[in-house]
């Protein structure tokens, strides 16, 4: 793939576009051992060797991040009124990142940020039914009958009959009248988890996604924090990609 030298360096987080242009003009950048002073010079990402101050800068076409999304942030690339999940990725200069799917504004938890469109498309395909598990606090005491309703596939409303889902009750707080649960769904309809609990006469008080396919949220990530995925985690997503 051919790209401009300044974009190459900015994508690899050497600096901002203006910062890397200054590095290039100061003759601190070499391509195939030759000093290059034109930021617009084309670089072959598959074959050229790029160095800054003698240090090699390899190119990675795709980036993958795990974000522990906080409430109050929207799952979008751009928004004129709200902070977006992309705004939280502070250490990356790439302009082509996007969230894989979405979490509601008031929902927390695991969200994948990438620029790999093919992987995202496959992971979100209705044909793949990639599992997603949520931790939630819901109003009232969840009965065994309601657990079975989820397991059998729940009629939610005229627009949605949910596929069978796994509902596990963790605890019940009788003083405050709420249940802590894990629920695993195999699709991702609009407000699906909230609508499912509304359909059984309950209400979601707090919602956090903790798994996406076989990938689990890193418990060391505080709300609003993120990190790059490991090679093993990327492989996990790729296995989900070819699943079913």
Question: Over which residues does each language-model region extend?
Answer:
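Basic, flexible Lys/Arg- and Gly-enriched helix-loop patches that mediate nucleic-acid binding at interfaces
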Residues: 2-244
